[in-house]
């Protein structure tokens, strides 16, 4: 277990910034719904789902002007016996940070560092938004990239829009005898989790708790669903997607070992593009990837242009930031070992570890 020295407590409210309470819930929901900068992860549904499923307390810092919310910063107090503590915006998300009037970013960032001290978190991580530039903050602009592209007018045009080499892979997959189902019931959830758990085990990383997927599906309602590709009635690829303001984001997806030969993952993403268009979406948000990683180049092969993302981190004096980067050299041997674990053991132990990787 990681041990940290006590961090001095500090007053929180200042510069028109305060910690939201239960009475602010309706105001926060309205602000997020009306704010052009808000992502799916800024929605209160995400904040509550992560807290409910994994126990990471959700907090919202409010910057107010004239009695109205001008900007806000949602955060999770992430705790793990293996990876330590951190105040993160936002837990298990690829986006986060301040939304609203960017003039309040500095004050909200300062308040976040004071909240971190109060919660004994030695670091604060902001995954997007206008970033603070004060003492102790470090901004990275080259570690991750986002990938978003418009959806085509129909299925044929969508296939044609895929670059030639990748389009050939999709065509090979479509020629195989596979079926696709979309839903969010118990059967869809069970198939998705089984496929996803095997997929991440094969990559050498622990699987998130099943409760997290269920909580997100329950909280988002019709704004989340599962698309599964089946071969001989067995699930071989599956993805849980989020829908937000005309964009679909395939968020948790993967395939079993057999999926590669079947090109099931290629079929999965193509069919999701077509399905999203029938739901009224006009954009496909492929999410973020670490720069120059395998996923980064996979998305480029689909014709998506990388857009650099800016993240910020603050660390208390004398404290070390947590390291949850799976590409870190310190985890190389552990990843190789995890890939060899029997699936039953990986699925039992994995959620106990991955719950702290928010």
Predicted regions and their residues:
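Active-site/acyl-donor-binding loops of N-acyltransferases
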Residues: 2-12, 77, 133-157, 282-358
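The substrate-binding groove and active-site-proximal loops of carbohydrate-active enzymes
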Residues: 95-101
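Short, high-confidence coil segments that cap the C-terminus of an alpha-helix
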Residues: 56-58, 118-121, 279-281
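Conserved acyl-donor/pantetheine-binding loop and adjacent beta-alpha core of acyl/acetyltransferases
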Residues: 78-95
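A short, structural micro-pattern
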Residues: 69, 92, 118-120, 140-143, ...
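A conserved beta-strand-loop-helix scaffold within acyl/acetyltransferase catalytic domains
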Residues: 7-8, 15-66, 73-83, 128-146, ...
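Non-catalytic accessory segments adjacent to catalytic cores
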Residues: 103-148
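Aromatic (often tryptophan-rich) hydrophobic motifs at membrane interfaces
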Residues: 62-66, 72, 93, 106-115, ...
């Amino acid at each position: 277990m990681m041990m940290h020295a006590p961090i001095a407590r500090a007053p929180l409210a200042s510069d028109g910034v305060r910690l939201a309470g239960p009475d602010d819930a309706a105001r926060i929901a309205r602000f997020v719904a009306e704010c052009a900068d808000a992502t799916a992860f800024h929605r209160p549904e995400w904040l509550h789902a992560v807290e409910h499923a994994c126990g990471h307390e959700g907090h919202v810092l409010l910057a107010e002007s004239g009695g109205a919310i001008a900007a806000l910063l949602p955060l999770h107090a992430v705790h793990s016996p293996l990876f330590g503590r951190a105040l993160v915006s936002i837990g298990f998300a690829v986006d986060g940070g301040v939304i609203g009037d960017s003039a309040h970013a500095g004050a909200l960032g300062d308040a976040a560092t004071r909240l971190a001290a109060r919660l004994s978190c030695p670091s604060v991580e902001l995954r997007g938004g206008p970033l603070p530039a004060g003492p102790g903050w470090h901004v990275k602009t080259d570690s991750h990239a986002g990938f978003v592209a418009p959806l085509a007018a129909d299925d044929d045009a969508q296939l044609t829009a895929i670059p030639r080499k990748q389009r050939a892979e999709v065509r090979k997959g479509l020629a195989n005898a596979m079926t696709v189902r979309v839903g969010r019931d118990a059967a869809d959830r069970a198939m998705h989790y089984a496929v996803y758990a095997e997929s991440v085990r094969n990559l050498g990383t622990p699987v998130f708790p099943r409760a997290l997927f269920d909580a997100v599906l329950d909280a988002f309602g019709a704004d989340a669903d599962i698309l599964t590709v089946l071969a001989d009635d067995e699930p071989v690829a599956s993805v849980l997607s989020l829908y937000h303001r005309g964009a679909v984001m395939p968020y948790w997806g993967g395939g079993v070992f057999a999926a590669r030969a079947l090109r099931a993952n290629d079929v999965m993403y193509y069919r999701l593009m077509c399905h999203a268009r029938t739901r009224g979406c006009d954009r496909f948000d492929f999410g973020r990837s670490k720069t120059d990683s395998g996923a980064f180049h996979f998305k480029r092969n689909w014709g998506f242009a990388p857009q650099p993302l800016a993240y910020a981190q603050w660390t208390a004096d004398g404290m070390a930031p947590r390291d949850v980067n799976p590409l870190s050299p310190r985890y190389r041997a552990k990843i190789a070992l995890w890939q060899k674990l029997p699936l039953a053991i990986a699925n039992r132990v994995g959620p106990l570890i991955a719950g702290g990787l928010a």
